[in-house]
Regions:
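Core subunits and conserved enzymes of cellular information-processing
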Residues: 2-166
Length: 166
């Protein structure tokens, strides 16, 4: 009976988790099309995209898988949301990008608006994604694992990771 209740609880969380992952992906693509800036991870992903036949979504998925593997070796057991994040963010990025929904605006005001929209979408997406409490994304899981393993502050570990991928 307990397993059935857990499964029902898990299934009830899926729409919010998937919405959060979709919104996060839409925010990433919006910042990309603003042509005004991206997160260090997206800069890393675009560097790979520019030198391989991989799409941005595929690159995000492969990077996420590598990070999950690295995290596992330092003792971080990924949650269900971590694995779903790795797959679905990449899937949704490519889906949204191929849809042609976003276009780069011609004006600086339009570009700034799209960048701000993307940042807001990522912020709200994080809320939806974390609210279901099924685990952190691969990148945050790695950060949490390194903070515990190295006994260093979050700002230092997060900064070091993001500077490394730049």
């Amino acid at each position: 009976m307990e397993n059935k209740e857990y499964l029902i609880s898990l299934l009830k969380k899926m729409p919010m988790l998937l919405f959060g992952l979709f919104l996060y992906s839409a925010g990433i693509v919006a910042t990309l099309y603003s042509r005004l800036g991206m997160s260090p991870w997206e800069v890393f992903h675009m560097g790979i995209v520019n030198h391989t036949p991989l799409t941005l979504g595929q690159t995000s998925q492969i990077t996420g898988l590598c990070i999950l593997a690295l995290s596992y070796f330092i003792g971080v057991i990924p949650g269900l949301a971590s694995v779903m994040n790795m797959y679905f963010i990449g899937f949704f990025i490519d889906l949204i990008d191929r849809s042609g929904f976003y276009k780069t605006p011609d004006t600086i005001l339009g570009k700034l608006s799209l960048l701000m929209l993307g940042i807001l979408m990522i912020g709200w997406a994080t809320f939806f994604y974390l609210k279901v409490q099924l685990g952190a994304g691969p990148r945050d899981g790695l950060m949490e694992g390194l903070v515990k393993k190295m006994n260093k502050p979050v700002w230092l570990i997060r900064g070091a990771i993001e500077l490394t991928v730049l």
